[in-house]
């Protein structure tokens, strides 16, 4: 019997050893694995202020006047205080101060969701664009939305307490003959991306800080990352103007009254031509 057992599998041997009244014991099937939980990023209990604060150094931001042509890749709307740009395209942001800040001053950029119901969520790239990251990203972690272009001194920070992402660069004074310092930012995910911003509006907060992290100045603007910045800017500005216009009065019910022909509204005043730059 021992020799025969060598030729049989252990499962068959166990079945032969069982009594006639015993039910056959089949090998136990492995328990099904529970599905892995979806990745959920922690919420932040810290919501940074977005209130404009020029501070002692008169800190403010400026933007180029790029117009609304189809070819533009980045354009700023002073009416909406909103930047429209394409994914990963250069977005020049000008920093202006009334007096030089102290040595060691830094400039921080951080994105937050604009609507209060989403403010505790950390703004990050969608999973697709995170996976598409390559060596050209340089120092930037793949999950960071905001990048600084052409600055090897940029630091990408993940706050251990608030979980928020930011990018910090040293403040550099304006060049001779210029009144502003320009930082070139990139936004690395579309506003419509599922799993990322998912059509939720965001604000970019730019802060001026001393070497210890103390606030010297703050400014912010809304950002929309889209395929056609010029078209989207025109559309949103038109919708904004329609909301601002007073509603026309309903016509009188009686048709007997004749309105005077001299009650025509005065012609709209011509707008002054805009300068080449906008400042906030």
Curated annotation (Swiss-Prot):
Modification N6-acetyllysine, positions: 70, 256, 272
- Give the principal location in a single coarse category: cytoplasm
Span list, region Required for interaction with FBXO42: 63-187
**Record cross-link Glycyl lysine isopeptide (Lys-Gly) (interchain with G-Cter in ubiquitin), residues:** 242-243
What GO biological process terms does the UniProt entry carry, in alphabetical order?
apoptotic process; circadian behavior; DNA damage response; entrainment of circadian clock by photoperiod; negative regulation of DNA-templated transcription; positive regulation of intrinsic apoptotic signaling pathway; positive regulation of transcription by RNA polymerase II; regulation of transcription by RNA polymerase II
Keyword 4Fe-4S in record = no
Task: Please identify the protein, giving its name as recorded.
Answer: Cellular tumor antigen p53
Which source organism does the UniProt entry give? Equus caballus (Horse)
**Source species taxonomy:** Eukaryota, Metazoa, Chordata, Craniata, Vertebrata
């Amino acid at each position: 019997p021992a020799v025969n057992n060598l030729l049989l599998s252990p499962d068959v041997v166990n079945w032969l050893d069982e009594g006639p009244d015993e039910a056959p014991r089949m090998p136990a099937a492995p328990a099904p694995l529970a599905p892995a939980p979806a990745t959920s990023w922690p919420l932040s209990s810290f919501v940074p202020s977005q209130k404009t604060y020029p501070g002692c150094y008169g800190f403010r931001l400026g933007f180029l006047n790029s117009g609304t042509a189809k070819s533009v890749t980045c354009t700023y709307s002073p009416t909406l205080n909103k930047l429209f740009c394409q994914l990963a395209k250069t977005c020049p942001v000008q920093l202006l101060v009334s007096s030089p800040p102290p040595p060691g001053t830094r400039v921080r950029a951080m994105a937050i969701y604009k609507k209060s119901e989403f403010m505790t969520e950390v703004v990050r790239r969608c999973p697709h664009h995170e996976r598409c990251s390559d060596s050209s990203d340089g120092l930037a972690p793949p999950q960071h939305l905001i990048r600084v272009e052409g600055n090897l001194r940029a630091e990408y920070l993940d706050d251990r307490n608030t979980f928020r992402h930011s990018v910090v660069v040293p403040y550099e004074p304006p060049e001779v003959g210029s009144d502003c310092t320009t930082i070139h930012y990139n936004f690395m995910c579309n506003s419509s991306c599922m799993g990322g911003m998912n059509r939720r509006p965001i604000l970019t907060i730019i802060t001026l800080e001393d070497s210890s992290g103390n606030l010297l100045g703050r400014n912010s603007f809304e950002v929309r990352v889209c395929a056609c910045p010029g078209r989207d800017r025109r559309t949103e500005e038109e919708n904004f103007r329609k909301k601002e216009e007073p509603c026309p009065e309903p016509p009188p019910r009686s048709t007997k009254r004749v309105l005077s022909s001299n009650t025509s509204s005065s012609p709209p005043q011509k707008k002054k031509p805009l300068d080449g730059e906008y400042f906030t």
